[in-house]
Amino acid sequence: PLPQSYSLTVTTGVELPQDLLLTDYDRTLGLLAVLDGPSAVPAPGGMQNADDVFSWIGDNQAKGISNIPAITFHANPTWSSTHWDDSLEDGLALITQAAQKYLGDAQIVASEYKKWRFATPRKVWPDPFFAAGTLVFAGDAFAGPKVEGAVLSGIKSAEYVGDLVGNN
């Protein structure tokens, strides 16, 4: 995430555009749950904005990511912000309760609750990366606020660096 990357530039003298420095991110609370059977998430195994709690629900087994029944839940920014300061126990209980209707007859046999501070950039930079000479910033704040955007940004920044190296 950009806010964590800025610390690398503090002693370099590299000046970054103000708009880039002001990039902010929504927080996301997440739950990864291992189940004792199949979930109730419909094919093809993913749901966006399923309800007033979750912005993403993914059945990892249905998507071919896991050999065992496992499901990932990402709470939306509003719900995540509201519950960010809840204790780990309370946060886990609330998100698990909200997830129940997507489990079907399955029970959670193991779970992990996550707080993702820099989850989704609120504003996307207009270019696929930012370069200050040989220092390149890339990621989801440049080419789109999902993993696909981060990958595309990384590819474009790698091409840029390749051109720099190839020209020397």
Segments predicted by a language model, with ranges:
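Short Gly/Pro-enriched loop/turn and capping motifs at secondary-structure junctions
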Residues: 78-80, 116-121, 143-144
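Short FAD-binding loop at a beta-strand-to-alpha-helix junction that anchors the flavin cofactor
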Residues: 71, 126-158
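Active-site-proximal substrate-binding core of FAD-dependent oxidoreductases
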Residues: 106-108, 162-168
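Active-site substrate-recognition segment that forms the wall
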Residues: 26, 32-84, 90-103
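Short, amphipathic alpha-helical "lid/cap" segments that border enzyme active or binding sites
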Residues: 92, 96, 151-162
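Flavin (FAD/FMN) cofactor-binding core of flavoprotein oxidoreductases
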Residues: 93-133
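Central helical "cap/lid" subdomain
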Residues: 1-44, 105
